[in-house]
Amino acid sequence: TKVQSGSGYHLDDYLAFVLKFHNNLFDKATMDENANYLETSADTIDDNLESVSINSGREAVSFGNMEVKQETKPRITLQEMNNTYTVIRVNTILSTEISDGVIQYYDLSETYKLRYTADRMYLLDYERTMDAYYNESIIDSANNLISLGIQNEKNISYIYSDKGYRVCFAVEGQLWYYDYQSSDMYKIYSLASENISDIRNATGNHGIKLLSMDDKGNIFYLVYGYINRGRHEGMNGIQVMKYDAKTNCNEEISFLSTSLPYDSMKEDLEKFSYLNSKSVFYCILEGDLHEIDLEKKKDKILESGLVNESLTASKDQSIIAIEKEQNLYKNKQIEMIDLESGKKQNFTTGSDKRIRAVGFLSNDFIYGEANAVNVSKSSNGTVSFPITKIH
């Protein structure tokens, strides 16, 4: 949250425009007003409803032939505001009847980039995503087909085992498990309540990351971000979870509390998080490198005080290199750790030299060496590191 003092931002005008544009989406008669702001490209595809932009056609922007209605009031978030433009996000949950008595729910997220002038409002950019909550009533077990409906592929994750006879997938804050042999579908975990229109479902600042699945269907996974229900409701952090397929029960292995916002947690987990073959999980949270033994349920901090770019990982993230000095321009030691074998290797240099990680070529570590007198840090924090030798 950022508190900003000022005047002349025309926030009331921005909000009025956004709400009017948003409400016009659900009324074909008023959609003409919205169409005037679109910049439809010649090659637009009007049946692409999962991802819509200012370059999309009128049909796609107004949901094509779908008859949708809002299940929740629009939830408005002010993302950016200055004297030049303002960015506003709108989230809501929609529904449509896909067959007699079968209701499908969707999470809708819109982003508006606007500029105000005394003459008119300019829509500089518009992006919208639409993702379906999984509906188990439309599974085609006879053909072993699971339809996820309207989805953005980047928001779907899945793992499978037992030659594909067991599959687990995460979509819209829900974790589902399907056993092909028994044709059974289970909702393992859900950040959304059974009442989809519950306002807590529309926060959008939490996620699920799948770690592993064995041939018995047991699953390790993470729930991270703002926890909106359960015993950690209202807290921010990472839950390390285990699902037992035999008992159909979830168990919390560990909970790592943090003040980091969801976007930062997601970025850190995408940058580095690794589960080795011995069910030991590694991740970085607020500068601490955690080693969590999922079987023994033990959490150990291997390193503290890590700063941006002080950890470098191989492509498969099984090997990491850590610069031991927080101040890069003072660093004289790098420790490399193989997270599968646990083996460590140290690289050092003389007192008149400095070293820093360059990266990995496959699993081969590369680092650079520079003369200490030539390494400097500017007033804006940028480090100049003229490498004289590559190792």
Question: What is the predicted role of each segment?
Answer:
Residues 1-65, 141-184, 191-193, 197-206, ...:
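Core segments of small alpha/beta cavity-forming domains
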Residues 84-127, 133:
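Exposed beta-sheet edge and beta->alpha loop/turn motif
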Residues 113, 177-179, 240-242, 291-293, ...:
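Conserved blade-register residue in beta-propeller folds
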Residues 56-102, 206-215:
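Surface-exposed, charged secondary-structure patches
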Residues 185, 249-253, 297-300, 342-344:
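Predominantly a core beta-strand signature of beta-propeller blades
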Residues 106-108, 169-170, 233-237, 382-387:
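Short coil-to-beta strand junction motifs in C2/discoidin
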Residues 327-338, 343-379, 383-391:
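Extended, charge-rich low-complexity regions and/or helical-solenoid scaffolds
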Residues 105-111, 206, 331, 353-354:
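Short, surface-exposed coil-to-beta transition loops
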